[in-house]
Amino acid sequence: MKPFYPLAPALLLTHVLCAQTTAEKLAEYMDATYKAKLFNGVVLAARNDSILLAKGYGWRDYENRIPHDTNSIFRIGSVTKPFTAVVILYLQEHGQLKLTDKVSKYFPEYKYGGNITIKNLLTHTSGIIEYSNQDNFFEELAYKPYTQKDFWKYIKNEPLDFEPNSEYSYSNSNYFILGYLIEKITGKPYEQYVREIIFNKAGMTHSGFDFKNLQSSYKTVGYDVFHDSVHIRSRIADSSAAYAAGGIYTTAGDMFRFHKALIENRIISQKSQQEAYTNYKEGYGYGWYIREWPKGKLIGHKGGIMGFCTLFTRGVSDNSCIITFSNDYSCSDNPETDLNAIDVPFLQILEGTYTIYYIPRVAIKSNPASLPQYTGTYKMDSTIGFTIDVTVKDNHLQAIFNNGNPYAFYEEKKDFFFTKQSNSQLEFERDASGKIIDVLLYFNRRKVPHLKIK
């Protein structure tokens, strides 16, 4: 269950999109991302009631060649936390608890409960240790039923990491206790109550908890690694081992229905939502990470659970929504494949604040014998004297700009090269005889010619 992290850099390349609609821009970005083999999963982007893009990319089940579509069912890991927080706020609205209540009111046997409030649990400011840190959790315990007794046995005598409310530290244990609290107050299993209060009200008919025993042709296979030549299936963790911190499975369409139900105040009031979307410590509210963006506040959560990664982002001011599911658990290990590499450009496109956005490029295998023809020194056709020195290194071009740091450039097509180190490209031009005479440097919307001088 991975938390939501700050924005990650992506392998990006400038591309002007003057005449396209927002939906077309989103689709083109995703088509290029998939072509570059940087994503396998499902994406949905919407604003208000309008779904602008909803599409599957790659394989739901690689071995059996079953492709993704918008019906694919994914585990969402820590994106479960907003659901748990919404139920807690629902109970507060109905007078069944107060966020100022001490944990000891409900669990008097927990010796630290007298210093910890429900609000501390919601905001990860309790100081309670991470339950999954116990020995053999990811090797053994996560794959079999994990009970409340198991949880308290480990937690009850472990000291707090810090004085409650003095610091922030993300801990799934907080949301386990919130789940147990929901059960104690309602007299119903957590899963049943979430279904009644959220799934049913929002119309989320393809969502649930027990993914291991789910019988559906739309059930997605999770992979620890999903690369060109390596596809390693994940073991399916028991939903009870993720519980109220990360146990939900769902579809992109159902997540959009959850988003709409919140916008329309069908589950909790606008007042409760405003409280939930407040930054209490370190950019975290009640089950939501909070970000400031040029056109207003963003709320969301990131989730990861064996075989699956999820990113759920919502724009408070424009009712936008971006849902990204991947069944490649390793995607967050690389900034090029991290789900933020989709989320950030999508936000830019939805806002319309940029006339450009960025598309990943795909390198072809260069012919080593052809690369030396591009080497040489190229000079800007001006009095500035800016130079580019091009050499060959490790079967790609290396360019040094004005005697600075070297940049590796990879061939996309004949005479056109790109770098992964910046938003720059080189396009070599030839004369009538086929001899290379100059190079065009593409950088920050500019196209700057450089003549070959040696």
Which residues fall in each region the model found?
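Bacterial Sec-dependent N-terminal signal peptides
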Residues: 1-23
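Catalytic loop of the DD-peptidase/beta-lactamase superfamily, centered on the K-T-G motif
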Residues: 20-55, 186, 192-195, 200, ...
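Active-site-proximal loop and beta-strand segments within enzyme catalytic domains
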Residues: 28, 39, 59-172, 188, ...
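Alpha-helical scaffold elements that line and support the substrate/ligand-binding pocket
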Residues: 43-52, 75-98, 102, 121, ...
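Short, solvent-exposed turn/loop segments enriched in Gly/Ser/Thr/Pro and often Arg
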Residues: 47, 109-110, 210-217
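Secretory-pathway/luminal and periplasmic proteins that interact with or process carbohydrate-rich
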Residues: 52, 111-117, 127-134, 191, ...
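Conserved residues at the C-terminal ends of beta-strands
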Residues: 124, 210, 442
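Non-catalytic beta-strand/loop surface segments
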Residues: 177, 215-220, 224
